[in-house]
Amino acid sequence: MSEKRIEQWEVERYWEIFSSLSNGQPRLNNAQAATVLRNSRLRDEQLEKVWDLADVDGDGELDFEEFCVAMRLIFDLVNGELSEVPPSLPDWLVPESKAHLVQATQALSGREPQFERVEEDDDTPGLKDGFDWYMSPSDKGKYEEIYSANKNHRGELAFSSLQDLYESLSVPDTDIRSAWNLVNPSASSTINKDAALAFLHILNNRHEGYRIPRTIPASLRSSFESNKIDYQLDNVRTAKRWGVDNDTDTSTGRKAKFGDAYLSRLGIGGRTSYKPQGTDFSNTIQDEEWEKVRLRRELAELEKKLAAANTAAEDRKNGRTVAGGPNWALIKKEALQMLEYKERELRELREGTGRVKEGENLERLREDVNTVGEQIEGLRVHLAKRNEVLAVLRRQIEEEKRNR
């Protein structure tokens, strides 16, 4: 079982890069990610393959989980951990929230991994007949402990997620795979809860010296094949606690009770978040984090605009010019002076007096006067709009303060 994973410090570093590029949005497009990807100096065809692998949902953009996948692939290529871009994502690098998409893609492309069907050896010495499908409450509680510790976010169990358990059992690898094939008739990469409990029950009995059955009761098989997914994870019953009684010795008196050492090593006293396969981002960047980023950015912008508006209003009140902006009072004054001057020239032209030069075009002066009048009207409209914007900003800030 691979021990590779994306470490927490890597996730935090990737988050800093991602948030600086995304402008508060939950996804990066190709243009936004191009700069940081090309800084790796990998060949364009390599970057294209990395993008295609990381874009698990195929929407042409990278969310944060997919961005982490892309960055880790790039770093492994740059550091020599990988000589070329792999044809598919390794299991440890697949985000758990998108594992079902990868499995569906593999199934459609015919690459779904399947175990070779292993014929049972009826002549295995020392094994007993009489396998019983009945699960005692204590055994079932223990199975649910193990299932809860290793299920993914969709309530399903992968074969490789129980590798540590397999190593703690006195069960050959061929028998473990035979039991998996028995409860997984569709050869899927994961099984549902009913199949998982049956799988653990088979392993328990094999650990106690019973032969693995050849068939499964029809009622159980139908529940395995339907493979209905319960997305309401809160509906999954809490695993029952179990203890070790004085009569918990195995039939041999020497073996450890099924799963005891494994559960003790996990430190399970009930439901746990232990997930040994894949990359789980559930405890890193949540949707609430995105909302916080957006709200902080919006609040900072609103506060900045309010401060600027208050400063401008105070400057206008005191007759000062707003730094970095036009002095509308001065512009208005100059425009009125220009209008007065043009009106005076027009009046002198009509009366034939004053300094009006011979041959000046009366129509030209009229156009100038009209232009100045339009400019003044435009300034008035603009001032009214800016006052409306200021009022809207103040209302938004008051709403933000009330919502805090």
Curated annotation (Swiss-Prot):
Every EF-hand domain range: 42-77
Superkingdom of the source species: Eukaryota
One Pfam family matching this protein: End3
Entry annotated with the keyword Metal-binding: yes
Localization terms from the record: Cell membrane; Endosome membrane; Cytoplasm, Cytoskeleton, Actin patch
Residues spanning the signal sequence: none
Biological-process GO terms, alphabetical: actin filament organization; endocytosis; endosomal transport
A molecular function GO annotation: actin binding
Any Gene Ontology CC annotation: actin cortical patch
Span of domain EH: 10-100, 139-227
Binding site for Ca(2+): D55, D57, D59, E61, E66
Membrane-topology annotation of the record: Peripheral membrane protein
Coiled-coil blocks: 280-404
Cell membrane as UniProt keyword: yes
Keyword terms of this UniProt record: Actin-binding, Calcium, Cell membrane, Coiled coil, Cytoplasm, Cytoskeleton, Endocytosis, Endosome, Membrane, Metal-binding, Repeat
Quaternary structure, from the entry: Component of the PAN1 actin cytoskeleton-regulatory complex.
UniProt similarity note: Belongs to the END3 family.
Function, as annotated: Component of the PAN1 actin cytoskeleton-regulatory complex required for the internalization of endosomes during actin-coupled endocytosis. The complex links the site of endocytosis to the cell membrane-associated actin cytoskeleton. Mediates uptake of external molecules and vacuolar degradation of plasma membrane proteins. Plays a role in the proper organization of the cell membrane-associated actin cytoskeleton and promotes its destabilization.
Name used for this protein in its record: Actin cytoskeleton-regulatory complex protein END3
